[in-house]
């Protein structure tokens, strides 16, 4: 009975500690700032299908359980999650800078949200990962396709975008 009372007493505190869901989760932590020291990735996006919509980069812990996991769950567990979103420029190179907590290995994913609805559209949108896989099947990718290693400063990485090809596979545009 005492344990139940203790749990009930702390329930409001525990509930208030949860981070509410929002598209802005991880953005403040992920944004690069001019002259700021620390680890970051400068992502050069290649192989875009078109210049519409937005480009979203997300950084995850480097393990299969946390890679592409729900941002709320990661943040509430105190795990790495960073996000950067930009409008795709009408011309020129498409680059995003995303900060990492420190030098080390992470999982990196990109979404070309061509219709700008902030959701992945299987038949419309493109995806990219840090290790540049040649193709993707219909299943959730493992960390091996997204693994990148940050140095102490800014680490450049090229990411090739993949778009739906055929019924359930993704590959680069031709």
Task: Give residue ranges: language-model regions.
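Short solvent-exposed strand-capping/beta-turn motif centered on an Asx-Ser/Thr pair
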Residues: 46-50, 101-103
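A short tyrosine-centered beta-strand micro-motif
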Residues: 94, 101-110
